[in-house]
């Protein structure tokens, strides 16, 4: 594990996409002690996922008490609430909506969830306003 600037890492990841449809609202200088390469992979998986299904993606980073929150909102078709648990299973793909004609093996969310859990955190899904998907990542400081 290493201490690194998570705000900077997220910013660098977003810049690599060179996509004007990704906006960011990052609290500066938030540091995290963890495996930077794995957090980087997780961020890429989550952003890739959102971009597959949405036009606009917004990423925010904040800190409350002893938790860090990374929130990724997209304006895609969303996922039915009854599928929220299932999409974290390896190779699981929803038949309709988000899975239509998209090339995916169904591992991105599973791997991301494993990475976050290995850091003592969690990933949750909820409906984004107005209709997309919100991915909430909690990490303990």
Model-derived regions, located:
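Conserved catalytic submotifs in the C-terminal HATPase_c
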Residues: 22-33, 64
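Short conserved segment of the HATPase_c
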Residues: 79-92
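Acidic ATP/Mg2+-coordinating residue in the GHKL
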Residues: 74
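Short beta-strand/loop element within the Bergerat-fold HATPase_c
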Residues: 56-66
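Short alpha-helical Gxxx[C/S/T] motif in the catalytic ATP-binding
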Residues: 108, 112
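Conserved glycine-rich
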Residues: 120-121
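A residue-level detector for a conserved hydrophobic packing site
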Residues: 39-40
């Amino acid at each position: 594990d290493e201490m690194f600037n998570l705000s900077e890492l997220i910013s660098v990841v977003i810049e690599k996409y060179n996509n004007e449809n990704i906006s960011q609202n990052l609290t500066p200088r938030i540091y995290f002690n963890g495996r930077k390469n794995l957090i980087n992979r997780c961020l890429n998986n989550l952003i890739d996922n959102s971009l597959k299904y949405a036009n606009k993606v917004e990423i925010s980073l904040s800190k409350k008490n002893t938790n860090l929150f990374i929130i990724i909102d997209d304006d895609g078709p969303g996922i039915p609430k009854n599928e929220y648990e299932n999409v974290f299973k390896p190779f699981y793909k929803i038949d309709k909506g988000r899975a239509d004609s998209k090339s995916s093996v169904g591992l991105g969310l599973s791997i991301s969830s494993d990475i976050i859990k290995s850091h003592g955190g969690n990933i949750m899904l909820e409906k984004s306003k107005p209709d997309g998907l919100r991915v909430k990542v909690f990490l303990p400081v």
